[in-house]
Amino acid sequence: MSATRAKKVKMATKSCPECDQQIPVACKSCPCGYIFISRKLLNAKHSEKSPPSTENKHEAKRRRTERVRREKINSTVNKDLENRKRSRSNSHSDHIRRGRGRPKSSSAKKHEEEREKQEKEIDIYANLSDEKAFVFSVALAEINRKIINQRLIL
């Protein structure tokens, strides 16, 4: 029984000044023909009709807060500070910087790696005594034997 009854929903309504009929707020016009003007349009029309003074015009135009700009004082102290800041930034540019994004070609990187290998291929065991070489070889053999004897489950 309660399902057949229609629920009364209270809507936001406004009354038409000409016919005093209640109309939903979302409607822009009344069935009698009266057209409701929104506040935005009303304010826009008022501003077109009466141009505001120069002070009010500037305030009306400026809606967002603007960034506060500091005035630079022309002095030798400020110039010295700027020069110091610039000299620091130049010293950082001397270091090799990696480019951002995908590299264009890997050939340059390969050349660098080859140069590094050639420089690093100096035999560090050339000056090693025979006794030390024997100790190292025994240690390596022991490590290899332990690795081979392990049962690895793959």
Swiss-Prot record:
InterPro entries: C16orf87-like (IPR040246), UPF0547 (IPR018886). It holds the Pfam family UPF0547. Residues 104-132 form a coiled coil. Residues 68-84, 109-119 have a biased composition (Basic and acidic residues). Residues 43-119 are annotated as: Disordered. The modification Phosphoserine is found at residue 91. It comes from the Eukaryota. Keywords: Coiled coil, Phosphoprotein. Belongs to the UPF0547 family. This is UPF0547 protein C16orf87 homolog.
